[in-house]
Amino acid sequence: MHYAKIKYRTIENGEGIRISLFVSGCNLRCKGCHNAQAWDFSYGNEFTEETEKKIIDFAKDNSYISGLTVLGGEPFDPRNQETLARFVKRFKEETNKSIWCYTGYVLEKDLLADNGRAHTQYTKDFLNSIDVLIDGPFDIDQRDLTLPFRGSRNQRILKMKDLNLKI
């Protein structure tokens, strides 16, 4: 897996001061996407064990960091899920900080359904480590810059614990 960039101190992609990991690769290609350069799966740098350690160590060494946000590109693209499922679990275990994730897929039909277009053997493990999921494709016709943490009205902020899903 590759990543486009890492921001170590951001406030725009979730509550508090967060680390944002922008992964590479997306086949959804939403019209008006703010990160179209990250559609290419080989864009940016390779996500290595050293990269993981640097992110985790930064979170552990800086108490003001609220957590990690994973966005893209598309974190739930089947090609990214194995690496990210393992990483977010490790991040959660080692830091006990929150994890937010943005996806253009819809939770119920694309991720949870066994025949969902982004469902893989890693999806449930990935979802189990996430505290907040922002789902739904960016829709330029529903764009609304006044919405907190979302770009369009069709996107949802889902607090995973509150959903009581049996994942």
What kind of region is each of these model predictions?
Residues 2-29:
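N-terminal pre-triad scaffold of radical SAM enzymes
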Residues 1-3, 17, 35-115, 121-125:
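Conserved Radical SAM active-site core
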Residues 130-132:
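Well-ordered beta-strand positions
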Residues 77, 141-142:
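Short glycine-rich, flexible loops that bind phosphorylated cofactors or substrates
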